[in-house]
């Protein structure tokens, strides 16, 4: 795959596909984490004298955070100390004319790419290639740099459609992500511990199945709704209130799948031994085998309990490699953040090479100033897809582009 330092960019028109999709509150972007993550790539291209065209999506149609990229332009301008012009167009005449008049070292950001219907659908590369987006913009570009790791599991025109038409190059963030995740997945250092939490239960089950079946993990610790499903699969009852909630989320349908994983790998999947419920607004911990478990019938489980935190901490402190995705509970409420913070702090304090991902996981790491984690991934779904053994469309597109252009391009100094 092409790396950013393989080429020189002075006077070249470069389309940078970033993923600046960010949380929004009251119409304003409230986190610049993804902007900062892609900053080294942008700075390198501008320092080299590229004519830079930035593209990103923001949310999806009909959502409250489905906004224009005008604020994205402001945030980038402030971080870079130079103007990144907001262009209220994607591939229409206005955008194309502005791209043609770019000067070396200048940058623009196109309108929210998902304002174009083509970029909302997932289609194979060949179909993406035939879209208006690709056909209108490709003739104006010299290179495509892709730094949108968080969207690496998606196949859309702006992400993969240009790969056979122009050299598609990994940005610094993409390269860092691929290297860190590959190291964690391929290593033979033991013990290798996976921590699976949060609400993406089906994705987490795929990860568990893949890493256990292929000898890539030695133990899996579970929490969040993933932990709920595995706890039910072990035959424990989590009470009417929690079963009702899980039924609404469609999670009870996944219990059989979790049972099958346990049938094959029972000793290698750990589940919580106690939970914390919201008892009239307070945190009350209940042991899974205690007489107080009647509380599960009336009150929601919002975190793992202290005994589980300690058991997980002991395992993590002795790990050599840790992969974690998703929180242990509803960390947004301080009294139910103990599990997430306790587990992530243990990961940071351990001597292991650690990779942590998932939007909520990242938010909790920054919120509680957790340090010592080797690599904080910008991708949640993309990271889960990677560890579940799926082929990621963007990584496939990088390979296709490399094979097509490796002999035809005059490489810059390394």
Swiss-Prot record:
Monomer. It comes from Thermococcus onnurineus (strain NA1). The keyword Ribosomal protein does not apply. Belongs to the phosphoglycerate kinase family. The keyword ATP-binding applies. One of its GO terms (cellular component) is cytosol. GO terms for biological process: gluconeogenesis; glycolytic process. Substrate binds at residues 19-21, 34, 57-60, 114, 154. It catalyses: (2R)-3-phosphoglycerate + ATP = (2R)-3-phospho-glyceroyl phosphate + ADP. It is found in: Cytoplasm. Keywords: ATP-binding, Cytoplasm, Glycolysis, Kinase, Nucleotide-binding, Transferase. Disulfide bonds: none annotated. Its main location: cytoplasm. It holds the Pfam family PGK. It is an enzyme of class 2 (transferase). InterPro entries: Phosphoglycerate_kinase, Phosphoglycerate_kinase_CS, Phosphoglycerate_kinase_N, Phosphoglycerate_kinase_sf. Pathway: Carbohydrate degradation; glycolysis; pyruvate from D-glyceraldehyde 3-phosphate: step 2/5. This is Phosphoglycerate kinase.
